[in-house]
Amino acid sequence: MSEPEFQQAYEEVVSSLEDSTLFEQHPEYRKVLPIVSVPERIIQFRVTWENDKGEQEVAQGYRVQYNSAKGPYKGGLRFHPSVNLSILKFLGFEQIFKNSLTGLDMGGGKGGLCVDLKGRSNNEIRRICYAFMRELSRHIGQDTDVPAGDIGVGGREIGYLFGAYRSYKNSWEGVLTGKGLNWGGSLIRPEATGYGLVYYTQAMIDYATNGKESFEGKRVTISGSGNVAQYAALKVIELGGTVVSLSDSKGCIISETGITSEQVADISSAKVNFKSLEQIVNEYSTFSENKVQYIAGARPWTHVQKVDIALPCATQNEVSGEEAKALVAQGVKFIAEGSNMGSTPEAIAVFETARSTATGPSEAVWYGPPKAANLGGVAVSGLEMAQNSQRITWTSERVDQELKRIMINCFNECIDYAKKYTKDGKVLPSLVKGANIASFIKVSDAMFDQGDVF
């Protein structure tokens, strides 16, 4: 069976490990690879519901429970027509290592449903969620497997899924994260991935410039227009940066003078009703007051002028090798991924070559991989689990402070492990290799201790 997305994720981890001195210094870790690459459990199930026309529909549901050595399975649910086992295995495999970098007790998993929610009524979406949870509820629990949202599963869907679980199991427990604030959710959870991405990028800037620079005055190109992109954009604007692009599946918007926080707010409210960026630009007054250019069928990378920072926040493989070259030519110095596997292997090679061959800071290009740069969402999910177990709610200041601490600790671990096990950067160490090595060692040690590997 061909599983290209999973194979790409697996080979990226293995290549980092093979290119390091880890197996030379600790040959016993090599035994972990064939074990950790196989999920502990894959659950596939039929989901049927009645649509608004009174017709029965059916779709394939999945939950990949990948690894629980570090804690309960933890990872999102994706409702999208592209959902298949290869994509969920790739996401679940990445989730194992990403979760380990948070420093919280979480394993890795991923699930979803192959369905398109666009154009469906709230009532039908509720029926879909209840039908999906009817089977999933047999396999999850607050100490077993704690799903969250992902593409196609936002606050509304989490609410329906949680209500279904509570109804089927007669139990109120922290079995899902991303819940509403008045029924067990955490403050800062919607913002967490975007904010965390910016905090990680800020740590990159601090390290590379010895604390001399920040987001202030930086030109930032962002893709996507969902939660991650919106909150990353708002945090960049708050920190004094200029956001020059956003995008969706149909095209992108470019603003050389900068997209405003008011425009981001309009995008946020309109996206709830599945409006495209093209519709939003034409319908909302904030876009007539502060002009932007809409480019149909395009990603932003080759359409922006000079940029300092690129934050892919849309979907997998959204930055090609040629687009990576264009970004480097336009002056980009920092790339950090808000999307999972946002850059193709060819694009990562372009960024990593620009880093490893640089002879001085002014030439260096630094790439922050998704398993480190975008773990803010799952980190705050872990904090939501902690709050649920204590039946308390933390303040937004405390959650934000914990998020910053987790992102900075993650960055420092990536640096430390890269320095210890790799020697390929004169100016800056590889965060790709650092993240892969650090997370692999954490998971491997837990598996050795518990007898999963012997």
Curated annotation (Swiss-Prot):
CDD domains: NAD_bind_2_Glu_DH. NAD(+) binds at residues 174-203. The keyword Cell cycle does not apply. There is a cross-link at residues 325, 371, 433 (Glycyl lysine isopeptide (Lys-Gly) (interchain with G-Cter in ubiquitin)). It catalyses: L-glutamate + NADP(+) + H2O = 2-oxoglutarate + NH4(+) + NADPH + H(+). GO terms for biological process: glutamate biosynthetic process. PROSITE patterns: GLFV_DEHYDROGENASE. GO terms for molecular function: glutamate dehydrogenase (NADP+) activity. Keywords: Acetylation, Isopeptide bond, NADP, Oxidoreductase, Ubl conjugation. The active site is at residue 110. GO terms for cellular component: cytoplasm; cytosol; nucleus. Present with 77500 molecules/cell in log phase SD medium. Homohexamer. PANTHER family: NADP-SPECIFIC GLUTAMATE DEHYDROGENASE 1-RELATED. This is NADP-specific glutamate dehydrogenase 1. It comes from Saccharomyces cerevisiae (strain ATCC 204508 / S288c). The gene is GDH1.
